[in-house]
Amino acid sequence: MKKISLFAFALLATLTATAQQMPEGSLPARFKVSADKEVVFARGNLQYTTQGEHTCADGTTQKGTWRIADNQYDIIGYENEKIAEDYTGYIDLFGWGTSGWSGSGAKCYQPWSLSPTINAAYSYYIGGSGTNNLTGEYAFADWGVYNAISNAGNKPQLWRTLSAVECTYLFYHNYWTLAAVNGQFGFMLFPTDFNEPAGISVKYVWKQDSANIPYYFEPTDYAGNSYTYEQFVQLENAGAIFLPSAMIRLNDNKIPQGIASLGSYWSTTQNYAEDDTEALGIGFGMDSANPNVTLGRCWGRSVRLVHDVDSKTALNNATTKSKAQKVVKDGQVYILHNGELFNILGTKQ
């Protein structure tokens, strides 16, 4: 009887491990954010409380607990006005770069930071400059890079925030619309291989079906996109991303009235905003959507994290790679993987 070699065992282990494990809290669909990069989204918006403690990418342990919302449509709402170092509830609207990293060089770097002055935005300058991004040497100012997210892998550097260029790529190269989930308004994004679940229809604002992306439109362009929780579960499982209209918080910690349909999400990018006191991010309302809306960095916006997918090893949206198996054929030992046969040297038969 032939014995399987150590090389064959190594091959077996390698082939079996080709399916990359996504972090806890990941949504199933993969989205291209550039020609050669894909991400998966966290299942909900980022939230923070001053209670507890967590580990950070620089090896320190910091005050507070970070988590992602249980559902894509969950928001904190007007409770964000209670933001303070001694507030023990959760918030989900943050100033730009407020990961808690003291090395950022910004005066306001904590998630509870406020600077209610006429020059408030200057307190959020990363590295002492108005043109630095939350990348490279300042990547720890990115909430997902610096912090362990308690219910999403609980390790630093598992997640990150999209850049403005990546947000633009998402807008142009995928499908999107506006919708309501059990009454919660928001922006809905779909991968290009999205198939509508049986009995559920979607009216798209953008489906790569015109020369120019429609930054402005009418509510009639997405009329009928209203879904129950149960229907949304099916949409989510099919690949839909939902960014709820979680509103914005001004630098005086107030949320304006009458903006329940407004959603605004940070990117890591400042360096091509029109004003050094601002940074870029996704913004939308009932009649507009734009991947690069500028707002004062002292304002509180939502954060939706992503995890980078290794395209060589990641799972497909709809299928799971099978485990490799040892098989014996005509007295020879082979490795069977995804329906293909390999010899012990790794050569496909």
Which ranges hold each PLM region?
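Hydrophobic h-region of N-terminal signal peptides that target proteins for export
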Residues: 10-18
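Short, small/polar residue-rich loop motifs at catalytic or cofactor-binding pockets
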Residues: 335-337
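Conserved positions within compact, well-structured domain cores
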Residues: 21-311
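Positively charged n-region of N-terminal signal peptides that target proteins for export
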Residues: 1-4, 19-20
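Short, glycine-anchored, charge-dense loop/turn motifs used at functional sites
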Residues: 342-347
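Residue-level detector of functionally pivotal "anchor" positions at catalytic/ligand-binding pockets or at interdomain
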Residues: 308-333, 348-349
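Sec-dependent signal peptide hydrophobic core
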Residues: 5-9
